[in-house]
Amino acid sequence: MYQNHKSEILLATPLIKDDIVFTKSVVYLCQNDRHGAMGLIINKPLADTLKDVFEELHISHTNTFKEILEYPLYMGGPISPHKIMILHTTNGRNYTSTIKLDEGLAITASIDILEDIANNILPEYFLPVVGYSCWTANQLTDEIKSNDWIVTNKLNKKILFNHENKVKWQNHLEHAGYTLQSLDTLFNRNTGNC
């Protein structure tokens, strides 16, 4: 039976292993309906930074704060790996290509938000991602039933946008009420050092 998980967090369980994309992934679900789901992995930083994006798109960044230039891009998923999107809190500004989500969040795929960021006009929280993850109709429901994903609606923006990527998966698990020990018990296996 279909259940809408839009604006919820997917946490990969230890059953997803040896998958370079989804092992220990934290996914924010931007869209979920009877036709499928679309989400962004938010804990897999890449070597590329916003400075690289600004240079590639010829966006002036001479006055951009250093910490913004060094901000990593995140691998949002395997689909359209060259498409950049910004997951961000709404800041009252209107961009050309913004989809408003729940909890005061939005996703924008137009250059105008990148120009604002380069000019230090920043949303309270933001995360630049390239690519996205998507599931066909019933695929996500089947994966959840197979215990590949833990779903939590306990959204915490500080954890969501935190840069402590090595512990973001564990932090989201704990915020959802799980511990590594409870996962070991739940899945009757040793998860090792998570």
From Swiss-Prot:
InterPro entries: AlgH-like. It comes from the Bacteria. GO terms for cellular component: cytosol. Pfam families: DUF179. PANTHER family: UNCHARACTERIZED PROTEIN YQGE, UPF0301 PROTEIN YQGE. Belongs to the UPF0301 (AlgH) family. This is UPF0301 protein FTA_1286.
